[in-house]
């Protein structure tokens, strides 16, 4: 492992249903990620600007999935907790946002900062589940969404990132449904269209490699993008940054991975290059 990474305080824990990031914010343009983002300042404050004209300053913001926004920080680094929408009840986001916008917001901001310190100290210890991370950050696990087994299987196919590209037709066939019926079921269950879901998961998969010295054109193909131009446009849309800027700002980022979402989670695997 690179000494610079080993000594860095920047870290990212990637889980199937959560991401905990504490590191450089960069200078992002407008972004539109496909998951709920809870931003917390490490020092100073944050500024959130939304596509509908909203402009607010504070130490904590919760932004729902697929909402265009720009986030900036007084300090170079910030914390971001990412929650995948298909993993929690449909009303969980609104309930959490309500809590965070009220008197509890400051308490939760403190919890998330404490979670950062705790995760930093636990680098070489046992793994952590989504429920445990939720409790560290929000005081309790977020209510889980119950999904149709056919949708669960299709999600597992989408996030495998190996072999032939996953299509709605292939998932529908595996589920024993027509393509139109499957697409309806998928959106009904997850609240997201199949196409948007697949695009977000593909962009999210990039995070696993963010601190590595890779040929980006080859990485784009490996992840499933048809070409480098499509790759760059997609990443900029979701993250507000070009792929090269993400990799440049992640050189000293220690990346950890917890492979399962529930109880019995495996220990972290460090991917620090």
Where are these regions (language model features)?
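Generic hydrophobic, amphipathic alpha-helix propensity
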Residues: 147-151, 198-199, 203
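Basic, amphipathic alpha-helical hairpins
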Residues: 137-141, 154-167, 186, 190, ...
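N-terminal regulatory/effector-sensing and dimerization cores
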Residues: 4-98
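Glycine-centered loop/turn positions within well-structured domains
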Residues: 69, 192, 204, 217, ...
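An amphipathic alpha-helical interaction segment
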Residues: 82, 101-163, 169-183
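…primarily DNA-binding HTH/wHTH and HhH modules…
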Residues: 5-9, 211-212, 222, 230-273
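Basic/polar phosphate-binding segments, predominantly the helix-turn-helix DNA-binding elements
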Residues: 169-198, 220-245
């Amino acid at each position: 492992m690179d000494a610079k990474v080993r000594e860095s305080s920047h870290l990212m824990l990637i889980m199937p249903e959560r991401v905990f990031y504490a590191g450089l914010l960069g200078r992002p343009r407008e972004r539109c990620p496909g998951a709920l983002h809870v931003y917390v300042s490490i020092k100073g404050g944050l500024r959130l600007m939304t596509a509908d004209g909203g402009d607010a300053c504070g130490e904590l913001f919760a932004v729902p999935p697929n909402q265009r926004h720009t986030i900036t920080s007084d300090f170079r680094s910030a914390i971001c907790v990412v929650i995948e929408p298909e993993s929690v009840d449909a009303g969980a986001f609104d309930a959490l946002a309500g809590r965070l916008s009220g008197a509890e917001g400051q308490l939760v901001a403190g919890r998330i900062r404490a979670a950062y310190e705790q995760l930093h100290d636990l680098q070489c210890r046992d793994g952590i589940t989504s429920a445990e991370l939720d409790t560290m950050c929000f005081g309790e696990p977020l209510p889980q969404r119950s999904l149709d087994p056919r949708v669960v299987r299709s999600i597992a196919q989408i996030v495998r990132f190996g072999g032939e590209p996953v299509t709605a037709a292939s998932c529908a066939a595996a589920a024993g449904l027509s393509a139109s019926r499957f697409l309806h079921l998928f959106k009904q269950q997850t609240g997201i269209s199949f196409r948007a879901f697949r695009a977000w998961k593909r962009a999210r998969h990039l995070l696993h490699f963010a601190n590595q010295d890779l040929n980006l054109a080859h990485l784009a193909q490996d992840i499933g993008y048809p070409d480098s131009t499509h790759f760059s446009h997609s990443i900029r849309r979701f993250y507000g940054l070009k792929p090269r800027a993400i990799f440049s700002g992640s050189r000293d980022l220690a990346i950890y991975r917890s492979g399962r979402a529930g109880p019995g989670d495996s220990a972290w695997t460090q991917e620090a290059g």
